[in-house]
Amino acid sequence: MYTVDLAYVGRGLHEELVAHIADQQGYYADEGVHVALRDGCSWDEERLRRGATIGLGRALLSRLTDGIPWVALHVNTTRPLFWFLARPGPLRPGPASLADLAGRRLAVHAPRTAPGCFTRIVLRRAGLDPDRDIHTVVRPPGDYGMDLRRLHDGSIDAALVGSTMAPEAIAAEHGWQVLAWVGDHFQIPTVGVAVDPTYIHPDDPAVRAVVRAHRRALRVIHGEPDTTVRHMQTFLGRHTADEVRAHYETFVAPYFTAGGEADLAVGAGAITAVATELGVPATVTAAEFYRTAATAPD
């Protein structure tokens, strides 16, 4: 049996769902690979690049800024699962759109992380300068629980939250509002499987086995809603079964890929946007970074 380390670099469905299904359904074992799932959220690039990673957004930023030659071999979705969640204030109505975040306090990821970069792209497209128009509160996201506490106590007006929760259900529960889904405003082939060929060849049999297992997990997502919702409840334990199913039907089933291949046109536009936001040249093409066509089923 082959072995490989596979690191996730964020929390929630966006990062973990496909690998979780592949593990729990026994697909890794079926494909003859032992996968050690690692928490790489706090790892530096040198440690991360010695195994496979799920975080394609972070891998792309690393390739553009540090020259680490990551390649993506499998893509789960082109719609990042992050949302702008806002509360009403005591003296004025809460923001109703992204443009209304002007002058507000927004909890966000650091600018040179993948979610932080994506957020800044979306804010600029809404006509906002993230450095001048908004009071940004940069924090490590964790499971976003502290963001909910700060929204409750009024120390922030809005937060960029991820998929450790169903934000539309949280908003309904507390009388808050989901201003926007990042995936509606910025598309990028993101989360999947990536490797640095310096350490792991893209055709390494262990990696190919992981890709096959993840492809099978995607088939579950599209063909077995009840099974997928059951797995999603592992991550969304604070929500009812109906809320989890609604979240699946709205954000997961329509947008996760069928077979793990990247849309290179979407990828090209995303690389240009990310490089522009980072202030670096776009030194890699979509075809060079997204090698998913080369990992067709064996």
Describe each region flagged by the PLM.
Residues 59, 146-234:
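Pocket-lining segment of extracytoplasmic ligand-binding domains
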Residues 2-131, 135-138, 147, 157-163, ...:
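Short, glycine-/small- and polar/acidic-enriched structural segments
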Residues 203-280:
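Secondary-structure end/capping motifs
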Residues 271-298:
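Conserved C-terminal helix/tail region of periplasmic/extracytoplasmic solute-binding proteins
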Residues 10, 183, 262-263:
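Short Gly/Pro-enriched turn/cap motifs at secondary-structure boundaries
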